[in-house]
Structures are given as C-alpha cells and as structure tokens.
Amino acid sequence: QDWSSFQNKHIDYPETSASNPNAYCDLMMQRRNLNPTKCKTRNTFVHASPSEIQQVCGSGGTHYEDNLYDSNESFDLTDCKNVGGTAPSSCKYNGTPGTKRIRIACENNQPVHFELVLS
C-alpha cells in the first residue's frame, strides 16, 4: 500500500459528520470503498491533516522497530469494528471515538500502513 491509499483508508479530516459513531463507520467504509468483496474486520480513521500524520514518520514520531513509528502526540480518531452485514454496501460497524497515539509503518518518510492504536 502507498501514501495515497493510506490516506483513503485512514484519514478523514475534517471529520465527516454523521449522527453517531456507528453510522459514521458504516458511511465511511462504504464511501471510501473499503469493503469491495468482504467486510473489513477493523479500520481506524484519524481526524488529522495528512501533513500532521506524515510528521509521525519524522520529528512527530518515535521509532519502534523495523519501519514502525509511534506518534508522540495523540490524535482524534474513530475505531471501526465490523459487527456483521454483507459486502460491499451493507457492512455494519461499531464505532468508537477516542484520542490516542497511533503506530504506523513508514516508507520514504510517508505513512504506508496503519499498524494499531496505542492504548
């Protein structure tokens, strides 16, 4: 995966409005076409600008191991976990908003993979 697909999968800034976190996840997973053949088990959307997230690969992050970096700052985010439904258009999600640090993989100073939300 590359930086542009990372942005499609994981960045929503400013945050898209929805009636509640579950509806937000259902909407965003469909809008970004993230369930083409099966419902993705879990996906996290970060509500920060691409440049802020890109900084985690440099001065805004701490090297963890290999090409993984942990953000120094916490980001507003929504964690989406699949709770059923069918792909591509009716996958159902349980959304949990939060403000947490993230771990991402970087290549050439650009985020290419979302590893996890740090607790």
UniProtKB/Swiss-Prot annotation:
<feature type="binding site">
    <location>
        <begin position="40"/>
        <end position="44"/>
    </location>
    <ligand>
        <name>substrate</name>
    </ligand>
</feature>
<dbReference type="InterPro" id="IPR023411">
    <property type="entry name" value="RNaseA_AS"/>
</dbReference>
<protein>
    <recommendedName>
        <fullName>Ribonuclease pancreatic</fullName>
        <ecNumber>4.6.1.18</ecNumber>
    </recommendedName>
</protein>
<dbReference type="GO" id="GO:0004522">
    <property type="term" value="F:ribonuclease A activity"/>
</dbReference>
<feature type="active site" description="Proton acceptor">
    <location>
        <position position="10"/>
    </location>
</feature>
<dbReference type="InterPro" id="IPR036816">
    <property type="entry name" value="RNaseA-like_dom_sf"/>
</dbReference>
<dbReference type="GO" id="GO:0003676">
    <property type="term" value="F:nucleic acid binding"/>
</dbReference>
<feature type="modified residue" description="Pyrrolidone carboxylic acid">
    <location>
        <position position="1"/>
    </location>
</feature>
<keyword id="KW-0964">Secreted</keyword>
<dbReference type="GO" id="GO:0050830">
    <property type="term" value="P:defense response to Gram-positive bacterium"/>
</dbReference>
<comment type="function">
    <text>Endonuclease that catalyzes the cleavage of RNA on the 3' side of pyrimidine nucleotides. Acts on single-stranded and double-stranded RNA.</text>
</comment>
<dbReference type="InterPro" id="IPR001427">
    <property type="entry name" value="RNaseA"/>
</dbReference>
<comment type="similarity">
    <text>Belongs to the pancreatic ribonuclease family.</text>
</comment>
<keyword id="KW-0456">Lyase</keyword>
<dbReference type="GO" id="GO:0016829">
    <property type="term" value="F:lyase activity"/>
</dbReference>
<comment type="subunit">
    <text>Monomer. Interacts with and forms tight 1:1 complexes with RNH1. Dimerization of two such complexes may occur. Interaction with RNH1 inhibits this protein.</text>
</comment>
<keyword id="KW-0873">Pyrrolidone carboxylic acid</keyword>
<keyword id="KW-1015">Disulfide bond</keyword>
<keyword id="KW-0378">Hydrolase</keyword>
<keyword id="KW-0540">Nuclease</keyword>
<feature type="active site" description="Proton donor">
    <location>
        <position position="113"/>
    </location>
</feature>
<dbReference type="GO" id="GO:0005576">
    <property type="term" value="C:extracellular region"/>
</dbReference>
<dbReference type="InterPro" id="IPR023412">
    <property type="entry name" value="RNaseA_domain"/>
</dbReference>
<feature type="disulfide bond">
    <location>
        <begin position="57"/>
        <end position="106"/>
    </location>
</feature>
<feature type="disulfide bond">
    <location>
        <begin position="39"/>
        <end position="91"/>
    </location>
</feature>
<dbReference type="Pfam" id="PF00074">
    <property type="entry name" value="RnaseA"/>
</dbReference>
<feature type="disulfide bond">
    <location>
        <begin position="25"/>
        <end position="80"/>
    </location>
</feature>
<keyword id="KW-0255">Endonuclease</keyword>
